[in-house]
A protein has these predicted regions:
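Intrinsically disordered/low-complexity terminal segments and short unstructured peptides
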Residues: 3, 19, 30-31
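Hydrophobic h-region of N-terminal signal peptides that target proteins for export
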Residues: 11-22
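Extracytoplasmic metal-acquisition and chelation regions
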Residues: 23-304
């Protein structure tokens, strides 16, 4: 498979047009998910040219490796990954790209989860019978805007290794973004304050960082086990719990079964709410702050 993908990659490289002089001066960055693309563009500004391998509407756990993705990696100076096994598929893509700058352990391979306070780290041995449980903990930390200062500092450090003379500019960009994020955080915290302690049901357990940040409680999951479709008996239990505890919101991702989520919510007297798991996951969530804006506004509206 890798040999075939490399052959397709070679053809793509032949067809690739020559980069412009302006583009050649930029640091070529590839990120695994669009949240990291958005944050890298905030920090890097005009110094970077950034591509993301996954789209916001895709389940980042299950990305299909294609020659177009390997082409992006083949030309990258830096690969920025989420880590915590969310983007473990990146190793396969890097192998096909044949770029020594971004192999695991190389200076151009950056895991920005370093320093993040990881939630839901399993306390027992994990096996496949438990579903898609992450042995290193829940990897969806970018849903908590409070993690952005750590992640953006890791990005600054990564870019400064390639362009050490531009560190001061990178730091200024970061501080400018964090100032805007602080203003937004004040707005989000004020809007979510009346909802503290409210219970929600989630389709898939990837929202714990967002819920914890704003004081909401994850009462149940629509999946029986992570990544495994629920049985009718499990769905009945969830509906009964939602009725008994007067839970009004069921959070669902764009790629999951909205028809099922709507049916469960309707039977429970609740609402199914589509949030943005990633930047670009829903219409209007095209920036990092914009994605959190959407999620906060959708929750506040649904819980009125």
């Amino acid at each position: 498979m890798i040999r075939t993908l490399r052959s397709l990659l070679a053809l793509a490289l032949v067809a690739l047009s020559v980069s412009t002089a302006a583009g050649a001066d930029k640091i070529r960055v590839v990120t695994t998910i669009p949240d990291l693309k958005a944050l890298t563009e905030e920090v890097g500004g005009k110094l970077v040219d950034v591509d993301a391998l996954a789209r916001g509407t895709q389940n980042a756990h299950e990305l299909e490796i294609r020659p177009s993705l390997m082409l992006k990696l083949r030309r990258a100076d830096i690969l920025i990954e989420n880590g915590l096994d969310l983007d473990a598929w990146a190793d396969v893509a890097v192998q096909g790209a044949n770029n020594p700058n971004i192999v695991r352990g190389a200076p151009g391979r950056i895991d920005v989860s370093r320093g993040v306070q990881v939630l839901e780290v399993p306390s027992t041995r994990v096996d496949r019978s438990m579903g898609d449980v992450h042995p290193l903990g829940n990897p969806h930390y970018s849903l908590d805007p409070g993690m952005a200062p750590i992640v953006t500092q890791n990005i600054v450090d990564a870019l400064a290794r390639v362009a050490p003379d531009r560190r001061a500019e990178l730091e200024r960009n970061r501080q400018s973004f964090l100032s805007r994020l602080d203003e937004a955080m004040t707005r989000w915290t004020r809007a979510m304050e009346p909802l503290k302690g409210a219970k929600v049901v989630v389709y898939h357990p990837q929202w714990i960082y967002l819920l914890t940040r704003f004081g909401l409680v994850q009462a149940a999951t629509l999946e029986d086990r992570p990544g495994i479709p629920a049985s009718p008996a499990h769905l009945s239990r969830v509906i009964r719990q939602m009725r008994d505890e007067q839970i009004k919101v069921l959070i669902v991702e764009p790629w999951n079964d909205l028809k099922l989520a709507n049916r469960v919510a309707q039977e429970a007297g609740a609402k199914a709410v589509v949030l943005a798991p990633l930047v670009g996951g829903v219409k209007g969530a095209d920036t990092y702050i914009g994605a959190i804006d959407h999620n906060v506004n959708a929750l506040v509206t649904a819980m009125k």
